[in-house]
Amino acid sequence: MEGTEWIVIIVTIIHIILAPGTKVEESFNVQATHDLMFHLPTNLSNYDHSQFPGVVPRTFIGPISLAILSSPMSFIFRFWAIPKMWQLLLIRATLGLMNAMAFLYFARSVNRKFGRETAMYLRLIMCTQFHYIFYMSRPLPNTFALILVMIVFERLLEGRYESAVRYATASVILFRCELVLLYGPIFLGYMISGRLKVFGFDGAIAIGVRIAAMCLAVSIPIDSYFWGRPLWPEGEVMFFNVVENRSHEYGTQPFLWYFYSALPRCLLTTTLLVPLGLLVDRRLPQIVLPSVIFIFLYSFLPHKELRFIIYVLPIFCLSAAVFCARMLINRHKSFFRMILFFGVILHLLANVLCTGMFLLVASKNYPGFDALNYLQFQNRFDAKKPVTVYIDNACAQTGVNRFLHINDAWTYNKTENLKPADLENFDFLVLGTYGNTLKTEVESKFVTWHRPLFFVNSFHQYKIKKSRQFPWIYPEIIYTEKAVVLKNRNYK
């Protein structure tokens, strides 16, 4: 492996270590992986999804794969009695490294197609941007699909179009049905140009049908067993989002939000270099245009999240990397080109500064995770006592998962909508808020039977501050108390 390839691996691990928590959108895959690792598949009543099924079901294919790949190290962890919280880092590292290797696989095809310098800059650019590396280890359906998407891009660059159809079909059927919006424009172009055959046994349609049938033959029996009813998860997701059009229940954004907000935040200062790459290499427009069309088509869905378009970030960065490589190669030909080359270096440094701030914020954005961890650390000598802990919905959504239930003698309760009077017998309460009213709520509802043990500060917002001294303008990160642990007054 080359030096910049190792940088991708190292940066991925750094992100995992500094921001180990998970949030509500990752909940199903995290909990399912935990249950597969610690419970027999014949004992589904102990599985988290049996108690908290969520709005739409998700496939178990991803968690099963993650549990199997993590099992050798998991066995070692258990043999040495290492707390299972560390196995959360293990599964995230496993997923992150799978995505890192898929990206490096794609980067090597860029090396063969565009040159060594372009591949080097592609890896460096991706390492200096926060969101792609951050999401690579997040147990999300998008992240499992991302592995296959990178393989699809690699196969397309190598001219292995039929193989690309196979991986594309699998990613759509198993993980993210909306990826058809990405693959449609891509494969349509290859079909029109005659590089991808449409009909016949080896045509795109026949290959897609065969792979879809194979994926359904795997997904439906497995997921039907775990969910206890006949089920194709992505089919239900598609019905929920497209037919019922209920995704707006999770919030909406303006039509162009991906273009003016999400992409600039993902690409950071690299945004300025993407169009320049399109100007210096005629091959790039046909590669980049389908990604633009994908984002445009996806914009019709009212509910928007940055992670929904994470797949196409390497394509935009490829365009920027081509420009950076040209500046590196031609830097000695003129003074102007030397200036542009230094601009390329400065843009990487600017990305690193922004990513450092994002990573700092992310490390303090999981109050539920921090609260339960510190509670268990403070009471580590009571690990074998029958302690009861109540975890409210806000903390459950901001980091608490079954990997954090490290004391077998403790009872962790996440029952929703309990009244304050129902909580008086719990030894500890782990409570959170999404606003700034935590202390007020504690003082008005819970002080009769419990007293605050400690509060957890978490990221609230950032502001742009102005100063008369250098650097004149800088971001200020503001933290507020987002979680509290209360201790029963009768607990000894």
From Swiss-Prot:
One BP term from GO: protein N-linked glycosylation
One annotated GO molecular function: dolichyl-P-Man:Man(7)GlcNAc(2)-PP-dolichol alpha-1,6-mannosyltransferase
Membrane topology of the entry: Multi-pass membrane protein
One GO CC term on file: endoplasmic reticulum membrane
InterPro entries (alphabetical): GPI_mannosylTrfase
Family under the similarity heading: Belongs to the glycosyltransferase 22 family.
Name this protein carries in UniProt: Dol-P-Man:Man(7)GlcNAc(2)-PP-Dol alpha-1,6-mannosyltransferase
Lineage: Eukaryota, Metazoa, Ecdysozoa, Nematoda, Chromadorea
